[in-house]
Curated annotation (Swiss-Prot):
A matching Pfam family: UPF0203
Descriptive protein name: Mitochondrial distribution and morphology protein 35
Cystine connections: 13-52, 23-42
Lineage of the organism: Eukaryota, Fungi, Dikarya, Ascomycota, Saccharomycotina
GO biological process terms, semicolon-separated: intermembrane lipid transfer; mitochondrial respiratory chain complex assembly; mitochondrion organization; phospholipid translocation; phospholipid transport
Gene this protein is translated from: MDM35
Family stated for the protein in its record: Belongs to the TRIAP1/MDM35 family.
Keywords attached to this entry: Cytoplasm, Disulfide bond, Lipid transport, Mitochondrion, Nucleus, Transport
Remarks, miscellaneous: Present with 3870 molecules/cell in log phase SD medium.
Annotated function: Involved in mitochondrial distribution and morphology. Mediates the import of UPS1, UPS2 and UPS3, 3 atypical mitochondrial intermembrane space (IMS) proteins lacking the two major IMS-targeting signals, into the intermembrane space. The UPS1:MDM35 complex mediates the transfer of phosphatidic acid (PA) between liposomes and probably functions as a PA transporter across the mitochondrion intermembrane space. Phosphatidic acid import is required for cardiolipin (CL) synthesis in the mitochondrial inner membrane.
Residue positions of motif Cx9C motif 1: 13-23
Amino acid sequence: MGNIMSASFAPECTDLKTKYDSCFNEWYSEKFLKGKSVENECSKQWYAYTTCVNAALVKQGIKPALDEAREEAPFENGGKLKEVDK
């Protein structure tokens, strides 16, 4: 299979995802695993990618449903069930 990365769910973000994936894989294999660095050096690429994804979530109308699902998430308090008002 090699080093094939998956595309982003939002096609307009795929280039940013590819850049982040490449940066992260290089950092992880060449620095982190060899004990040369513990700080992820790809935060700029990650921020650019997540900003694009968040914009796509809004554009596609997915964000409100995602926010609602996060509100209803049963394990959002350190693995403990969230108390629900009855």
